[in-house]
Each structure stands twice: as C-alpha cells, then as structure tokens.
C-alpha cells in the first residue's frame, strides 16, 4: 500500500493459518493453469505457492516493521473472528477507524447472513500431499508470521 498515494487509507489485514490457506491457493492456481495446459504438475504448483506466500507475508511484516507510524491505520483481524461473529467483527472494524454503524446497516448485515448461511455452496477440502506439501514445512515457513500476528495454528485435516 502506498500511503503517499492513499494518505487516508484504512487497512484491515485478515489473518488465517497458512496451513489452511496454502493448499487452497495451490488448488486454485492448479485449476487456473489447467485452463491453458494439460501438463500441470500439482507438486510444482504447491512448492511455488508455498514460496510465493512465504515471501509475500515476510515482505508485509518487514514493511510494517519499517514503518511503525502506519500501525494506527492498520487493524489485524483473524479469520476466526470473521467466521464466528461477522457482525461483531464489522462493528470492531468500524469502531477502530471511528466510523458509524447505523441500526439499518447492522440489520442489513444480519439479513444478508440469514439469507446466505455458512457453507451455502458446500465445503472444500484440500490435501497438502496432493500438492507435495508437508505440514512441518508449512509450520517452519510461517512460524514468524503466526507468532507476530498471534495466528492460532489450525490442526491440518485432509
């Protein structure tokens, strides 16, 4: 984010355990590549996604460390907060940035959530092994990220 271009930016950085994210993005990337090729190696895709996401998260942490003056304009939110109580999470975000939440807005959020229940479109399961990934490698690669943002490890389930 270029704060010089967007001086009034308010950032919500969401966090989820990479052991749940990496197989998902590897599956998405694998599927996208299949559109243009019949020769896609899922294990290669898995290694690439692990490398890309480790690099991106490390760069993000380095940027935040280098610019502590920006921290007041960044709110960290866990995926667990979002899923467990979406309305409270949105209210937390708005309160952090001193934005109003009207009763109508709150009501519309509840209406939307009632009309679109969790897992409305099914549940996706991804395998680390299908992408040549091992739980220990992910735990090692993302240890610093988990510690910095207090990301609770989610047990891997195939």
Predicted regions and their residues:
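ATP-dependent NMP and nucleoside kinases share a basic, alpha-helical "lid"
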Residues: 1-15
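C-terminal, active-site-flanking charged/polar segments
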Residues: 11, 17, 97-101
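Short beta->alpha linker loops
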Residues: 16-17, 81
């Amino acid at each position: 984010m270029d704060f010089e271009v967007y001086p009034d930016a308010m950032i919500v950085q969401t966090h989820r355990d990479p052991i749940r994210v990496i197989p998902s993005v590897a599956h998405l990337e694998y599927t996208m590549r299949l559109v243009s090729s019949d020769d896609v190696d899922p294990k290669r895709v898995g290694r690439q996604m692990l490398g890309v996401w480790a690099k991106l998260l490390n760069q993000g942490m380095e940027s935040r460390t280098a610019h502590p003056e920006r921290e007041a304009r960044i709110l960290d939110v866990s995926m667990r907060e979002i899923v467990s109580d979406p309305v409270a999470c949105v209210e937390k975000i708005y309160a952090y940035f001193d934005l109003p939440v009207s009763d109508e807005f709150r009501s519309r959020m509840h209406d939307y959530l009632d009309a679109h229940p969790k897992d409305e479109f099914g549940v996706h399961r991804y395998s680390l092994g299908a992408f040549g990934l091992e739980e220990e490698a992910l735990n090692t690669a993302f240890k610093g990220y988990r510690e910095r943002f207090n990301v609770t490890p989610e047990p891997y389930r195939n």
